[in-house]
Amino acid sequence: MNTNARFGWMLIGTCIAISAHGGEVPVKLASGEQAALVQSRCSVCHSLDYIVMNSRFLSRTAWEGEVRKMMKVMGAPVSENEVAPIVDYLTQNYGVK
């Protein structure tokens, strides 16, 4: 494949990727004392949509399990001292009602 054709395909791929991402609506977390902490820790690895999408399914115990899984399995940058405040925020704002 010549250089011009390769460049053309790269340009097309870039345009598709940009347009696919452009349609996303940013998620604004519920206000709360720990909202900034949750946003800064969770958004390192995934969209904040994950929190909203799972909110109707997760109890306090389940949220804690999710946070610990993200730490241990996925390597999330959450310290042990941050687990309780994050779980408190998630349970209060996004836990099973």
Short names for language-model regions:
Residues 33, 37, 62-65, 69, ...:
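Extracytoplasmic/secreted proteins, especially bacterial periplasmic and envelope-associated proteins
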